[in-house]
């Protein structure tokens, strides 16, 4: 009992000492600063900044047409014409009431950030705010016109962009400043629940997330995802699913047609991860052998993936409890997985990205446990847990005492499984467990420099274990890709997969300067591309229809023209041309990259691509699939009812304002950026290490083929792991923060 009282007193003292949070005011002082009486001049200045911010939201360059200006002033030219263009780009009275109301609402937070507190002009606020403003201005232009024309296409456009950028910068700097203050507060306070103040709500939340931290979240996730499973049974096809299954059965498929096969009799190849192809194909083969039905085999795979994905999400939530995260944070993470339709949709989608995402989630969770610093100099490296003591009569928590548990054999097994899954379910994915294990080992070795002899020994063992997982994973990957695959005649993937950026740049340059020779009727020919340059490009990409194949948002059509027989000399000649064209028109090359990836930083007006039952049915019915298999969706009344309900809910989330942001890649990318900046300014290197795998996923997206405006599949692993990383890094108690 005395130990419990000492623990409670220590906790209260820690709460009082951290009430202000690192760099933030106390709640009472913040409230006074928000609502105190400011000088009229400061309030007026804040209102003016709020008007500027709302003006940024209302600018629409398409309103300023030549006809509209002619009706006002037919003789307008020069500077006068530019002024008309700028003024007509504003919304006018059409949205005046809404924008005025928004400006009034924004006045209070802007006044508080500018005049009530210091720190608004710190680099950690100003730099991300400026980057956000630039992304909003240029992102809108690329989203609407596939170019920077709306942002810098003339003097009037530049003026409009400066106004819009200034407004977005005001919004962003205020928002980032307040967000960082919220991070400070959440890091110092636990939102507490009690039966007296919350009644049944407290009992339900406690039963859900405390008494059964894994089983109940797993049941909740499985139950809420079940309608999607029933609607999609036996599983959702996407573009690559049929090709992977045909590969396993050694049947013709799109990838084996263009590769130079090392064994013409073996059509299985490394365009898709061979391990995942074997898993999907093996399940289909099992269904045919046992049930005589390929759909039964597909259902086996879907159920397996569904179970693994739901279990990883539940394990993530349960681990947050063991790491000391509060009830509200854990409930929010669980609700995120339950209510965002992307997760249930992907859980039944037959694609490599889902199991790779599960591996990344598991890797992040295990990495967090290894990264935990010692609670005291004599503590062992491993997992921090809460020793919950309860009263049998009331079920109320008496005390929560921080204790330290060893990194168990089960934890090492999960770490190895996560590392192997990341390495084998994504081509090139071996870099993720390698980076995670090396970082974890480095921190364990650093912790081994202090503490008791036993603590140092445990830290060294943890470091050795992390390095052993890395070595085993890399060795297994190399043995599989360099020994087993050649021995079985399995051809590796193409070199073209890593060349999306230069290929897109070349195609855009050809469209802009030499479209007449690159497949565009009536295209340009300004003489900047000579015959030798065309020939050098043709030997690698095929020049005759290069510009016609160019899609600003997706590089697949351009990459598909890659000649697998191109020699090293051909590639060297091509990159020589690429460099000369870069120097000739660098803006074109920058636009090619911006156009292909702006959706990761700008909330596009386009709806993200959803893998629904309608598109799956079309893919199942394609001739190249129908020729060998009879895949089809279950057509029962319950399946149809679930399909309608799931589709309706998904559309609602996509279209309802604010909720629709959960279906935008840019929201998650900016969340990762801002959390990283916050940790960087606090110099929390240990916590930043946990975000390295997530940054790795984003980096892969930014050299990949697709735009985040319409494809979230490539970012899915980062989205899955982000809630866990954010809660562990920022919430009370901050286990990964240095003392």
Which residues are covered by each model-predicted region?
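Transmembrane signal-anchor helices characteristic of membrane glycosylation enzymes that use polyprenol
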Residues: 42-62, 128-141, 211-238, 471-483
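Membrane-interface anchor segments at the N-terminal boundary of transmembrane helices
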Residues: 78-101, 296-300, 595-694
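Transmembrane-helix signature of polytopic, membrane-embedded enzymes
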Residues: 122-125, 129, 214-216, 316-339, ...
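Specific aromatic-rich, kink-prone transmembrane helix
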Residues: 170, 174, 249, 355-378, ...
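Membrane-proximal lumenal/periplasmic loop motifs of glycosylation machinery
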Residues: 231-238, 251-309
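Transmembrane-helix motifs of polytopic, lipid-linked glycan transferases
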Residues: 300-324
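Membrane-interface alpha helices of multi-pass inner-membrane proteins
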Residues: 411-426, 472
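Membrane-proximal stem/loop segments at transmembrane-domain junctions that anchor or position
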Residues: 487-637
């Amino acid at each position: 009992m005395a130990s419990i009282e000492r623990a409670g007193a220590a906790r209260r003292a820690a709460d009082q000492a951290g009430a202000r949070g690192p760099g933030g005011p106390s709640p009472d002082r913040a409230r006074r600063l928000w609502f105190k009486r400011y000088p009229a001049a400061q309030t007026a200045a804040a209102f003016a900044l709020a008007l500027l911010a709302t003006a940024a939201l209302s600018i629409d360059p398409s309103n300023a047409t030549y006809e509209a200006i002619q009706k006002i002033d037919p003789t307008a030219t020069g500077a006068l014409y530019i002024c008309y263009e700028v003024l007509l780009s504003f919304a006018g009275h059409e949205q005046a009431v809404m924008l005025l109301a928004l400006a009034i609402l924004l006045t209070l937070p802007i006044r508080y950030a500018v005049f009530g507190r210091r720190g608004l002009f710190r680099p950690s606020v100003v730099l991300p705010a400026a980057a956000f403003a630039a992304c909003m201005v240029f992102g809108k232009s690329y989203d609407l016109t596939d170019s920077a024309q709306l942002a810098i296409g003339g003097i009037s456009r530049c003026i409009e962009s400066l106004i819009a950028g200034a407004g977005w910068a005001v919004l962003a700097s205020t928002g980032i400043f307040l967000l960082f203050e919220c991070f400070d507060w959440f890091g110092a306070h636990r939102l507490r629940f009690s039966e007296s103040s919350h009644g049944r709500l407290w009992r339900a939340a406690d039963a859900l997330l405390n008494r059964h931290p894994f089983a109940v979240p797993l049941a909740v996730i499985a139950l809420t995802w079940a309608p999607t499973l029933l609607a999609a049974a036996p599983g959702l096809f996407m573009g690559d699913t049929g090709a992977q299954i045909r590969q396993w059965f050694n049947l013709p498929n799109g990838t084996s047609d263009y590769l130079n096969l090392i064994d013409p009799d073996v059509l299985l190849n490394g365009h898709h991860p061979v391990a995942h192809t074997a898993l999907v194909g093996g399940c289909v083969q099992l269904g045919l052998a046992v049930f005589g039905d390929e759909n039964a085999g597909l259902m086996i795979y879907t159920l397996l993936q569904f179970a693994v994905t739901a279990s990883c999400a539940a394990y993530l939530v349960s681990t947050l409890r063991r790491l000391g995260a509060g009830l509200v944070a854990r409930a929010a993470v669980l609700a995120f997985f339950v209510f965002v339709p992307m997760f249930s949709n992907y859980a039944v989608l037959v694609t490599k990205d889902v199991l790779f995402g599960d591996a990344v989630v598991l890797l992040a969770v295990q990495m967090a446990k290894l990264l935990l610093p010692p609670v005291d100099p004599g503590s062992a490296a491993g997992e921090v847990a809460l020793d919950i003591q309860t009263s049998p009569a009331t079920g109320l928590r008496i005390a929560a005492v921080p204790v330290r548990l060893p990194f168990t054999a089960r934890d090492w097994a999960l770490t190895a499984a996560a590392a192997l899954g990341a390495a084998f379910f994504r081509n090139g994915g071996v870099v993720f467990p390698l980076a995670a294990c090396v970082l974890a080992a480095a921190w364990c070795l650093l912790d081994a420099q202090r503490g008791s002899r036993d603590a140092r020994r445990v830290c060294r063992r943890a470091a050795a274990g992390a390095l052993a997982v890395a070595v085993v994973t890399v060795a297994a990957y190399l043995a599989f890709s360099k020994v087993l695959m050649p021995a079985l005649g399995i051809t590796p993937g193409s070199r073209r997969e890593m060349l999306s950026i230069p290929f897109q740049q070349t195609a855009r340059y050809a469209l802009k300067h030499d479209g007449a020779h690159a497949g565009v009727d009536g295209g340009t020919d300004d003489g900047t591309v000579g015959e030798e340059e065309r020939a050098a490009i043709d030997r690698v990409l095929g020049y005759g229809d290069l510009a016609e194949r160019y899609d600003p948002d997706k590089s697949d059509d351009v990459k598909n023209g890659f000649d697998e027989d191109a020699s090293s000399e051909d590639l060297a000649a091509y990159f020589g041309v690429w460099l000369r064209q870069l120097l000739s028109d660098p803006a074109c090359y920058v636009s090619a990259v911006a156009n292909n990836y702006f959706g990761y930083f700008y909330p596009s007006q386009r709806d993200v691509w959803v893998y629904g039952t309608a598109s799956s049915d079309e893919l199942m019915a394609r001739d190249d699939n129908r020729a060998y298999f009879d895949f089809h969706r279950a057509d029962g009344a319950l399946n149809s009812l679930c399909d309608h309900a799931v589709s309706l809910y998904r559309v609602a989330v996509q279209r309802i304002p604010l909720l629709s942001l959960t279906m935008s890649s840019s929201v998650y990318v900016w969340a990762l950026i801002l959390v990283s900046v916050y940790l960087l300014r606090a110099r929390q290197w240990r916590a930043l290490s946990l975000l390295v795998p997530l940054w790795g996923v984003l980096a892969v997206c930014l050299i990949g083929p697709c735009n985040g405006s319409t494809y979230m599949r490539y970012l899915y692993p980062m989205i899955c792991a982000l809630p866990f990383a954010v809660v562990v890094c920022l919430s009370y108690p901050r286990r990964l923060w240095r003392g």
